[in-house]
Design a protein with these regions (language model features):
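Bacterial N-terminal signal peptides that target proteins for export
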Residues: 1-14
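C-terminal segment of classical bacterial N-terminal signal peptides
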Residues: 18-27
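Extracytoplasmic copper-binding redox domains, predominantly the cupredoxin/blue-copper superfamily
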Residues: 27-230
Length: 230
């Protein structure tokens, strides 16, 4: 009996020690900061220099419509895998388009695909991160899909080949879709040097390095360039 009691005591002590280590590794409020910034999309345009007969066209930059900024996701690229809470998001099928075309969710989240059109749609994906086929369903119906792995999932309609959307799935909470002005906020980011990425569904991504410190938000801005048309 004494031997059994000692074993129980040893196991209990080990469990308490392990719990203490786990608690100690959880970041406190003092170990967290935030990242704020703005995303713009620069479109190359051609402008005339001067009014001379010999004036030549020169490249310039204009900003894309604000609606395009809703197709951007900003995230901490080197973020550690972290326990996350599943979300519920929605991509509607409207006028033979996915609305919105881009959503960002945590692992385990469900994305619903309501059909607002007076025709059938068939949502599917062949992405490695998540392969699925929701089958055909009519107006007024909705079908959902759980996304259980991190990564990029390209979504299409099997009936209308011009329809496409993207689901970005993260195993950490440090990501955001900018608002219509391009502004974003990433709260609760661990302190230190990080790689911050701005991703656009068609323009790809760009990454900058940023140090997050306590006491004040770290700020960063992105301008995503659109390739010039020949």
């Amino acid at each position: 009996m004494i031997s059994g009691a000692r074993s129980t005591t040893v196991l209990l002590a080990a469990a308490v020690a392990a719990l203490a280590v786990l608690i100690d590794t959880e970041p406190s409020a003092q170990d967290l900061g935030s990242v704020r910034g703005r995303v713009s999309i620069g479109i190359p345009v051609t402008a005339k220099r001067g009014t001379s007969t010999y004036s030549r066209s020169v490249p310039n930059m204009a900003l894309a419509p604000e609606s395009e900024l809703r197709h951007v996701v900003v995230y901490v690229k080197d973020a550690p895998k972290t326990a996350v809470t599943p979300m519920r998001a929605e991509i509607r099928q409207r006028n033979e388009n996915f609305v919105p075309r881009v959503v960002a969710v945590t692992v385990g989240s469900t994305v619903d695909f309501p059909n607002d059109d007076p025709i059938y749609h068939n949502v599917f994906s062949l992405s490695r991160t998540k392969t699925f086929d929701l089958g055909r369903f009519p107006q007024g119906k909705s079908r959902g899909q759980v996304f259980d792995k991190p990564g990029v999932v390209k979504v299409f309609c099997q009936i209308h080949s011009h329809m496409s959307a993207t689901v970005m799935v993260f195993d950490h909470p440090w990501f955001a879709v900018p608002d219509e002005s391009g502004t974003f906020d990433l709260p609760g980011v661990p302190l230190g040097l990080h790689q911050i990425t701005a991703w656009h569904e068609r323009l790809g991504d760009t990454t900058q390095q940023l140090r997050v410190e306590t006491g004040r938000p770290a700020t960063i801005d992105f301008v995503l360039p659109v390739p010039a048309q020949p």
